[in-house]
Amino acid sequence: MVQVARMVKLTLAAALTTAAVAACTGPGDAAGSGTAGPTTVPPTSARDSARPLSQAGAESVTPDPRVGALFLGDTTTHTCSGSVLASTTGDLILTAAHCLLDGVDAAFVPGFGEGGGDAWHVEAVYLDPRWIADQDPRADYAIVRVAGGKGAGLLAEAEGGLTLGSAPAPGSSVTVTGYQMGEGGGALACRGTATSSQGFPSLACGGLTDGFSGAPWVSGSTVTGLVGGLDGGGCDDDVSYSPVFDDRIARLLVRAEAGGPGDAAPEALASDC
């Protein structure tokens, strides 16, 4: 397993380098082939916790089938997190825009945990024009169409998706669930109170290290943010940020549901961390 750095975001190039060094040889085609990463992911030995979530730091939890790990390239190392969206097409997930790069294959495994899981391969990526233009951190989100799996469909496998909502009001309670970067490893989650800092939703919650980028901020069954935005989610693993969810991400969902060609994901600019 890789050693996890002490801040949420690596640049994508660094994450890919770390993944390539750390990963065992796994199945899958080369980057850019159109078939992403592993077809199935081996099981993990994570220990889950039935305790109530702490507001102080992330703890082991039973995997949420609506939340999963994102694998880049031909490796068994997951580098980001993501979530299944409730959609008319039933094949859309949400993650951070800085987790993706055009020409690098990716696969998403919902509910990643002890039993491993089936990989859903990225087919198209839909991005806010502000991210395409200059990687505006306020638009650090991506809605992704996936295909594959072996069940009745992504929503069935995920036991339903998360409804896309608006940015959390300051003082509201949110739960963040995701995965630290590495091979294997179980789901971690933390509950905290949303605030606002420098124009971004923020959340004080320890342990949200590399790999949590793209992890959803959830209230009930609604996703109101994700780990990303300012400095790719934050330079300190005790405080995380989210891009602002507003009418622009809602329009992006409508576009993704309509289908059609996706966007070429640019490499994220280096953070100021």
Task: Describe these PLM feature segments.
Residues 2-87, 245, 251-273:
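Protease-domain processing segments flanking chymotrypsin-fold serine proteases, especially trypsin-like
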Residues 49-54, 90-94, 155-161:
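Charged, amphipathic alpha-helical segments
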Residues 52-65, 73-74, 106-152:
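Conserved catalytic-core segment of clan PA serine endopeptidases
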Residues 59-113, 193-197, 228-229:
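Catalytic histidine site
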Residues 69, 92-94, 142-145, 174-176, ...:
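Structural recognition of the beta-strand scaffold that forms the well-ordered cores
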Residues 137-211:
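Chymotrypsin/trypsin-fold serine protease catalytic domain
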Residues 207-228, 233-234:
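Catalytic nucleophile loop of clan PA
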